[in-house]
Structures are given as structure tokens and as C-alpha cells.
Amino acid sequence: MLKVVLLMMIMMLASQSEAQLNRDFYKESCPSLFLVVRRVVKRAVAREPRMGASLLRLFFHDCFVNGCDGSLLLDDTPSFLGEKTSGPSNNSVRGFEVIDKIKFKVEKMCPGIVSCADILAITARDSVLLLGGPGWSVKLGRRDSTTANFAAANSGVIPPPITTLSNLINRFKAQGLSTRDMVALSGAHTIGRAQCVTFRNRIYNASNIDTSFAISKRRNCPATSGSGDNKKANLDVRSPDRFDHGFYKQLLSKKGLLTSDQVLFNNGPTDSLVIAYSHNLNAFYRDFARAMIKMGDISPLTGSNGQIRQNCRRPN
């Protein structure tokens, strides 16, 4: 009985936090916010299309560790270790300088008003749009955490690139996201790149991989650990800089670069979703947008909780 009561209390608190988020949160206090963010992101993505994937990844990593609170952006301080150097994020997340540039411009225009957590949410949406993907209404009103959680970032809440389908399902379920949400959000791998160290085991040892695909990837990813670890390969071979459904088509051909990608189509319960998204771009776009909105609702700080950081890299 106690467990049921506690669960109901958690659900009530979550729904209250979500209710405080809305698209028009800055309509009066910072009306040009969306325009300023879009301009900076557009310039960054035009200069380097891969940056769109990086900015989207920042939002995912932030939300999965203690909620969408901007904690990922914090540098180390004497009192805590930041999340940037945690296992899942070290040498993986990037784009912080783009967020810094947006924050600088927004602070000049609307000082002390817009949170870094909300800037992450908007940049994720704009990055997808600028690379040809779907748009969605970004709910705003998050506040920033005053600390980071290095231990939580290393606790497995962010699934590793070598993982099982059941672990993926469970990790997303723990965040309030369904299996459908997980498969749709995995479609973000239709853009971006991965380092050799994350897919070496798959291209040399996996059985559920297209042989010619594996051989082609081995040319730039030596079998020896420590050799060429940081060399990169596109997650989507055909259209790496366009947000489409090519990722799912690759899975049907056993050409998923990461183990955590190919497990989505490997004679399991998510096969039907992969097939559906590979055939229907609009269905993928619809479910991806819905899942992004749900992900943005993960444990936000609202009301008087947290703060509005003046600099995204450090607490006030």
C-alpha cells in the first residue's frame, strides 16, 4: 500500500511540473527568444551540419540524468564534478560553445529570464528542423540546477552503445518513455557520427551484420583496442546530414552501426516499429516529435526550484 501511495505522489508531482511548462512561457518576458536561438543554430549547422546532431544529443544526455535541468552544461567546480567527463559524455557530447553563444545573446536581450535548460530544448528542436526533420511545440519554463551529478551520469541511466534491447526498453521506461518512444527517439541516429571505439566490437564480432558493410567500416576502424578509437563513421550511410528515415532502412539491411541500434531489428518485439518507420516517414516524424515533447517533460525544475543561470557553465 505504501508503494502505491508513493508512486501516486511521484506521478502527481511530475504532472504538476509538466503543467507549469508551456510554449508561451517567455511570450511577454522575452518575445524574440525563438528568433535569436534559431539564428545562432542555423549559422552553426550551416557551418557544420554534424553540429545539429550534437545539439540534439546534448538535450538527450541532459534530460536522462536527473531530468531536463541544464546540469550537463556545468563545468567542474571545487564542490562537484560536472557530467561532461562522465563515461557516457566524455569525448562524446559537444556543442557547448553554441549554447554559450545563444546564452550570451539572450542575456543581453532578456537578462536573468531564460534558463539554459530551456535553451537546450529549443536548440534540439531547431537542429532537427534545420536538417529537414519535423518540428514540434517546445514547452518552456524549466529552471536550471545549481549542481551536476557525476555519479548519476555514470550509473547507467544513459544506455551504452553496446547494450541489449531489454536494457534499452527498461532505461527509457524508467524515464517515463514507452518502447515506441524509445524506437522513435533512436531515429535521431539518422544524423551524426560515432567513434570507432563504440562500434569496433560489432563490425568485427557480430553475426547480425551485413558482411560488406562490416568490411567497409573496418577500413577506418582497426581491430586493436586503442588504435584509431576516435576515428568516426556516419551513423546513416546514405544521408548522414539529413533528418529522414534512412536509419531504419539500414537496420532492415543489418547495417546498423551500433549494437544498440541493430537490436531494434533483430527478431524482437520492436521489429514491427522499425519496419513501419522505414516505410512511413510521416509516422516516424509524428512519433519522434511526440517523444521529444515527452522527453522534455522529464523532471523539470519549475517555480522557485533551481535558478536562471547567467552563465550556463557555472551556478550563479
From Swiss-Prot:
Any Gene Ontology biological process: response to oxidative stress
Origin: domain of life: Eukaryota
Main location group: secreted
Record-annotated disulphide pairs: C30-C110, C63-C68, C116-C312, C196-C221
Entries under InterPro entries matching the protein: Haem_peroxidase (IPR002016), Haem_peroxidase_sf (IPR010255), Peroxidase_pln (IPR000823), Peroxidases_AS (IPR019794), Peroxidases_heam-ligand_BS (IPR019793), Secretory_peroxidase (IPR033905)
Gene3D superfamilies referenced in this protein's UniProt entry, alphabetically: 1.10.520.10, Peroxidase, domain 2 (1.10.420.10)
EC id: 1.11.1.7
Membership in a protein family: Belongs to the peroxidase family. Classical plant (class III) peroxidase subfamily.
Additional observations: There are 73 peroxidase genes in A.thaliana.
Protein name: Peroxidase 67
Organism: Arabidopsis thaliana
